[in-house]
Amino acid sequence: VIMNCCRYINRTNFEIELLVGDRVVPEYADECERLGIQIIRLPLKHEYTRQYYVKLFKILRDKKYDIFHVHGNSAMVTPDLFLAHLAGIRLNLVHAHNTTCDYPVIHRLLSPFFRLMYKKGLACSIQAGQWMFGKNRFEVLHNGIETGIYRYNQEKRKEFRKKIHMKEEFLIGHAGQFDAQKNQRFLLKVFAQTAEKQENIRLLLAGNGPDFEEIMDEIDKHPYKERIIVLGDSSQMDYVYNAVDLFVLPSLFEGLPLVLVEAQAAGLTCLVSDRVSHEADLSGNIEFLPVDSTDVWENAIKREICKKEDRQKKSENAQKRILENEYDAKNSVLKLQKIYQDLSEEFGNVRREI
């Protein structure tokens, strides 16, 4: 989402700097450098919390940004907003990306203060906005994608499957941060149960995150570890979607994940946790399943293995519906630009530094 903004925003009118308190994908860092966008690295927020806030305040005080646009999942962004207020930044935007968080009690305690701290609330979906902002007003800004990149391409499929040594095997794909929310441990259980009876299936995991090492340890002990491929972070997700035959996302909670929009654009059927916003079904190719039963997921995978579908046609139809529903990256960024412009004009800012 942030990278699409960096790619398509009018940099004649807007200057962007990224303040990052997490690990940065190297390919994204390289792209930002090519685009002339500075990434200011903060101490890792979850490991060095005090140092993170100290450095954040110094930067906000020195830079005096016109707009401070915060991405988060809960009212735990309140300290960031408070520091921006102390630093004299008047235009604070909050962008919600999830429908719950790891610390819901703290979220509820901070919510009354949080809702006094921002000028504009944005959300990737209605459910995410309701979770984050309660009865306060917010605007839905869809997580747009570059639709053309994800269009199904047989040559990309052949190339990537050759790269990962896949022939005619049925390849199940998953992409997401390795953490409790994305529920990879449940997925590994489902795969073990399904692989026991289906010799021709494989599992591909793309992503990284705080639980990466622990999940890798579980894979090492997995009865079918030789059938599991771990990519880590990948800048070739368009190739990944083309290579796989089915996409799975058993998350414990989500707003409207970008990976689901991308997977649908590539003509994939997606098996998705029923805790994910149903707004994510843009193509009619999503099946929502409970995450308390491995049997249900196993049966759904079996059904997909037996299907013979025209991926090219599915991709074309899905792309039309994605565009109709305004999930195109360029349109999303144009909408965000308008939000920035309106706020700047309303509050008299002219530099438009974000």
What are the functions of these language-model segments?
Residues 73, 233, 252:
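Aromatic "clamp/platform" in nucleotide-sugar-dependent glycosyltransferases that forms part
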